[in-house]
UniProtKB/Swiss-Prot annotation:
Induction: Up-regulated upon exposure to O(2). Repressed by PerR. Keywords: Detoxification, Disulfide bond, Electron transport, FAD, Flavoprotein, NAD, Oxidoreductase, Stress response, Transport. Belongs to the FAD-dependent oxidoreductase family. Binds 1 FAD per subunit. Monomer. Disulfide bonds join C26-C286, C137-C216. It is an enzyme of class 1 (oxidoreductase). The lineage of its organism: Bacteria, Bacillati, Bacillota, Clostridia, Eubacteriales. This is NADH-rubredoxin oxidoreductase.
Length: 379
């Protein structure tokens, strides 16, 4: 039986950040990676499709870095169960590993849906997924992506950049429904249409048989936390594993971070949040006293020259005031509550979006404001 001081389940952004944070504080770290590769930059998977990059091009660190820092990476393995009482993790192979501190950074898994008329359905979550999509796009000659979120739009652009036509189908009226209001979503749809990314809205896939049968069909309809292996434990969970500001779970010496973690009801699934949570978990597993403060989600999309930044909860916001501006190449929306910007989105000007995010982060007050220009002039 193997043993380790810190065992990290997962080698994505949160898992790698946890391992990196523990360097110099713990000399015995083991990472479990379900894939056969060393940790890599998952956000760069589109480059495998668009730019013919290889796994070596997107690795976070080469093998010698792990050897130098005494970090063991066990590949092609994943946890099937945890025994917190005896501090044991059982892997798919049946091997058991004893730990002193456990960090669960198992990430998420792609949501799967049934698509009528599709013989095979793909999703992009791993390097091997990217290779399969790349090959199928060549075979079919075109791609049809179901899902109009950030991943779906970026994937469509990557496939188009590879030389294969791609379109998107969504059941709603406009794309990026979580990041944009209706006006912004329709503005973006029009921009993408003009750039060659066709978006079918209010789609009934049952009636789109010809397109679906002739395309590489890819779903990009969100993810869910990967936590089936904790079901027989007393580790508290709802949508994700419940954690406090030290990334501690309900069980002593077990931490969770990234997509698998739920922090006071929030589970945004963004890489900057995963990185920070992983850092906090890694430090605290080594006996430090680090705290995580909620980061206001601010996903950024850059595709075909269009930049989008969204700050706060646009989707569920109930503002007291809303200010909008639509220009030829720019769209702005600001949602205010109690004279403070609670959420905002900008298409076409990332620097302005960054200023609005700073105003949200600092809870800047905008008293007696009656126009968007007045807000922008006081950022």
């Amino acid at each position: 039986m193997k043993s380790t001081k810190i065992l990290i389940l997962g080698a994505g952004p949160a898992g790698f950040s946890a391992a990196k944070a523990a360097l110099g504080k713990c000399d015995d770290i083991t990472m479990i990676n379900s894939e056969k590769y060393l940790p890599y930059y998952r956000p760069r998977l589109n480059e495998i499709i668009a730019k013919n990059k290889s796994i070596d091009d997107i690795l976070i660190k080469k093998n010698d870095w792990y050897e130098k820092n005494n970090i063991k990476v066990i590949t092609s393995e994943f946890a099937t169960s945890i025994d917190p009482n005896n501090k044991l993790v059982t892997l798919k192979s049946g091997e058991k590993i004893k730990y002193e501190k456990l960090i669960i950074a198992s990430g998420s898994i792609a949501n799967k849906i049934k698509v009528p008329h599709a013989d095979e359905i793909f999703s992009l979550y791993s390097y091997d997924d990217a290779l399969k999509i790349k090959d199928e796009c060549k075979n079919k000659g075109k791609a049809f992506i179901i899902g109009g979120g950030i991943l779906g739009i970026e994937l469509a652009q990557a496939i188009i950049d590879s030389g294969t036509p791609a379109s998107i189908g969504i059941i709603l009226e406009y794309p990026l429904e979580r990041q944009l209001d209706r006006d912004g979503g329709l503005f973006l749809k029009d921009k993408l249409d003009r750039l060659g990314i066709k978006i079918y809205t209010n789609s009934n896939f049952e009636e789109m048989g010809d397109l679906i049968r002739s395309s590489c069909v890819i779903t990009a309809v969100g993810v869910k936390p990967n936590l089936d292996f904790i079901k027989d434990t007393e580790i508290a969970s709802k949508r994700g594993i419940l954690v406090n500001d030290h990334m501690e779970t309900s069980i002593k010496d077990i931490y969770a971070c990234g997509d698998v973690a739920e922090f006071y009801g929030k589970n945004p699934g963004l890489i900057n949040i995963a990185n920070k949570q992983g850092e906090v978990a890694g430090l605290n597993a080594c006996g430090e006293d680090a705290s995580y403060s909620e980061i206001i989600p601010s996903p950024i999309l850059k595709v075909s020259g269009i930049s989008i930044i969204s700050c706060g909860d646009i989707e569920n916001n109930k503002p007291s005031k809303v200010f909008r501006s639509t220009q030829e190449d720019k769209y702005i929306v600001c949602m205010l509550k109690e004279n403070k910007i609670d959420a905002a989105a900008v298409i076409g000007d990332v620097s302005l979006g960054t200023k609005l995010k700073k105003a949200i982060d600092s809870s800047k007050s905008f008293d007696n404001i009656s126009s968007l220009d007045a807000i922008l002039n006081n950022l």
